[in-house]
A protein has these predicted regions:
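Short amphipathic alpha-helix that is part of the acyltransferase structural core
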Residues: 1-56
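Conserved catalytic-core motifs of GNAT/GCN5-like acyltransferases
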Residues: 111, 121, 126-141
């Protein structure tokens, strides 16, 4: 998988559409969670895109410290359902963490869906609070 990092203004219309389509496919349709994915934060985020051939297969967005939380943060971690089981989730997160390290982001906050706790602890994240519900889905601050 090839990864690239782009600001919101660097995303061409077709690429932005692919990002929003993937996020909607997983976070709204697959997880049966009606919520507003377009939250007004994409403009401040940096977008980590993972491609196989010319198809977007994985994605995250990352915020510098102070743009979302006090620390930097990674969110909207998603892998296309048709491309799961190929370690793309780990690859996109490792690319996101490498970018954060290169930018000297010393602390990263995530809000992880609880069923993915092991995935995130294997990447070095630790629990930092109680479990909570976000849009009806159990989450864990890390």
């Amino acid at each position: 998988m090839k990864t690239t990092v782009k600001s919101f203004s660097e995303l061409p219309t077709q690429e932005l559409y692919a990002v929003l389509q993937l996020r909607s496919e997983v976070f709204v349709v697959e997880q049966d969670c009606v919520y507003q994915d377009l939250d007004g934060k994409d403009q401040k985020a940096l977008h980590i895109l993972g491609y196989e051939q010319d198809q977007l297969v994985a994605y995250t967005r990352i915020f510098k410290p102070g743009d979302y939380f006090e620390q930097s943060s990674i969110g909207r971690v998603v892998v296309s359902p048709q491309h799961r089981g190929k370690s793309y989730g780990q690859e996109i997160m490792k690319a996101s963490l490498a970018f954060a390290k290169a930018e000297n982001y010393t602390s990263i906050k995530i809000s992880a869906q609880c069923y993915l706790d092991k995935f995130y602890t294997d990447l070095g994240f630790v629990f930092t609070g109680e479990k909570y519900l976000e849009d009806g889905i159990p989450h864990q601050a890390m």
